[in-house]
Curated annotation (Swiss-Prot):
CDD domains: AdoMet_MTases
Species name: Sorangium cellulosum (strain So ce56)
Keyword S-adenosyl-L-methionine tagged: yes
UniProt-recorded name of the protein: Ribosomal RNA large subunit methyltransferase E
Family: Belongs to the class I-like SAM-binding methyltransferase superfamily. RNA methyltransferase RlmE family.
Amino acid sequence: MPAERPSVSQKPKNPYKRPDAFTKAAKAQGYPARSVFKLEEIDRRVRLLRPGQRVLDLGAAPGSWSMYAAQRIGAGGKLLAVDLSPITAAFGPQATVVQGDALSLTNEALAQFAPYDVVLSDMAPATSGSKIADQARSYELFMRAVAVAEALLAPGGAFVGKIFMSEDFVKARDALRNLCEEVRSIRPEGTRASSVEIFLVGLKRKAAGKTG
């Protein structure tokens, strides 16, 4: 069953309070993390996921995005979930889990179900305490995800990638515009007030050879 978001009235007055309404709702619905509601909102707003699709999820641990995507694509779809950390969540027979670093895995290793209809990246750096360093690392992860999408995303396909807001945001957005016909920036309702993250969504991947 797709994730059911908590109502706005359920959100705590203190945005730093833990667990908040999204955390509680995720746990109640069997998802490992509240991040599921970010993907649910993006999916709802751009009609991202459909039955039978092939999906690549980069930075999949602890597994909420992959669980949601597996439900949406159904038994006729295919899902490859990749993360450096172990993933113990159950996604169903349509899913395969690869434990590895998305920055170092070859495109061939990620191509089990390619070409993909959707490439997802919720990858984020382990924060270091240095804002500049964390932003640079986030940009690097985002650009790696875009490079994977360039190699493995089917024409007409969609991309979702997380990035920390910084002076590199425009470069990241332009790189995705070079790949997709339409690009949107979305900050889901479930994002904590203190977070600097935003999601860039690319729709209608351009045909091979068509850029700019």
